[in-house]
Amino acid sequence: MDHRTPTPDNPWLALRNLTPARIALGRTGTSLPTGAQLDFQFAHAQARDAVHLAFDHAGLASQLSDRGRESLVLHSAASDRHQYLQRPDLGRRLNEDSITTLRQHAQANPGGVDLAIVVADGLSALAVHRHTLPFLTRFDEQAAADGWTSAPVVLVQQGRVAVADEVGELLGARMTVMLIGERPGLSSPDSLGLYFTYAPKVGLTDAYRNCISNIRLEGLSYGMAAHRLLYLMREACRRQLSGVNLKDEAEVHSLENEDSASQKGNFLLGKE
């Protein structure tokens, strides 16, 4: 401690370089320093903004088209953001116009598909805007050899996880992958979640889904998330199930070298 420091140095201070978690914030008397308090308020504001940010489905559809992917823009039964937040049940189902759109698509393309990819804003459209395309790029690279047929990417406004079950059932999809913005945390306003379901249908519980969470640069890399998803998909096709009876036992032979702020190692073990 010196004349410029009102409190002794925190011995945990060095760990701050190894994790984005709020540790070793310091103190001024019995309170947080001004800088730490302002950082907390800023992170809280970012989380609130992420929840209420509008889903730019048109922009995402255009970007998908530029990469050769068709898309369908649908809407859940929740008419607006306020209703979506107040009525989670409505976010799990499609509205009537969207149901009609999917039925017409299924009639024009009979026989079903192996995979339906659904993208919904969830509680963080920011996560969807930032991470959907990079993840799908890595997924396509790794899945090319499997030869699965897929439906157009379905973009659902005001959607929750279970809406993918209805999408998959209407399209006759053997599997669904839901990409959705996770509830923002105070250090992660842009975390993307992935939910995989085999044999989707309306009414399934979370026990029938597998989750891969925290897909973002500071969390799970796009390539690693795609690797884990493909393991689940291949095992699901072999065993004809998903959820609690299907464990992620994918082997990881090497760490990826992606431009990522996550390459800091485990803060408990230090850098390797």
UniProtKB/Swiss-Prot annotation:
* GO molecular function terms noted in the UniProt entry: cobalamin binding; ethanolamine ammonia-lyase activity
Q: Name one GO biological process term.
A: amino acid metabolic process
Main enzyme class = lyase
Q: How is the cofactor bound?
A: Binds between the large and small subunits.
Where on this chain does adenosylcob(III)alamin bind? Answer: V161, E182, C211
Coiled-coil intervals, chain numbering: none
The protein's required cofactors: adenosylcob(III)alamin
Instruction: Give yes or no: UniProt keyword Transmembrane helix.
Output: no
Cell compartments where the protein resides: Bacterial microcompartment
Q: Which reaction does it catalyse?
A: ethanolamine = acetaldehyde + NH4(+)
| Keywords (A to Z) from UniProt | Bacterial microcompartment, Cobalamin, Cobalt, Lyase
GO CC terms in record = ethanolamine ammonia-lyase complex; ethanolamine degradation polyhedral organelle
Q: Report the EC number(s), separated by commas if there are several.
A: 4.3.1.7
Pathways per UniProt: Amine and polyamine degradation; ethanolamine degradation
Q: Which domain of life is it from?
A: Bacteria
Lyase keyword on record: yes
The family database entries (Pfam families) matched by this protein are listed as: EutC
Recorded family membership: Belongs to the EutC family.
What is the protein's quaternary organization?
The basic unit is a heterodimer which dimerizes to form tetramers. The heterotetramers trimerize; 6 large subunits form a core ring with 6 small subunits projecting outwards.
Q: What is known about what this protein does?
A: Catalyzes the deamination of various vicinal amino-alcohols to oxo compounds. Allows this organism to utilize ethanolamine as the sole source of nitrogen and carbon in the presence of external vitamin B12.
Name of the protein: Ethanolamine ammonia-lyase small subunit
Organism, per UniProt? Answer: Pseudomonas putida (strain ATCC 700007 / DSM 6899 / JCM 31910 / BCRC 17059 / LMG 24140 / F1)
